[in-house]
Amino acid sequence: YTLTAEIHYPTYFHRRGMVAAAREGDKENPEWRSDGSQFYIVWGKTYGGGMMERIRQRVKNSTNPPIELALEHEDTYWEVGGTPHLDGQYTIFGEVIDGLQTIDEIQLAETDENDRPLYDFRIIKAYILKE
């Protein structure tokens, strides 16, 4: 099953530790509907200097309608890291606020040909925090 996209960009963006709903590609899913059961935790890398300008152009040229990356996020991508090329295209619904070292370990797990871990990882405890 799928869910209506709830993209609240630039409020929520793909900095390291954010949790977002996976989805099918744009051709199969032009409404960007989110998968009801699959998600990803953003890791990415840090970006600096001219790299952000190249990513900004790439995103603008590859999205329809064109998405303009927010300049105010550049320091976060420089210091914390993330995946700016995904901004404005996926539903972000959570954030890892403790345990990023565990996420670092998960990303090193052995995977199959579809980049899925050979063994399942389970979230044992999650909390809903109000802003």
Residues of each region from the PLM?
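Cross-family detector of peptidyl-prolyl cis-trans isomerase
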Residues: 1-131
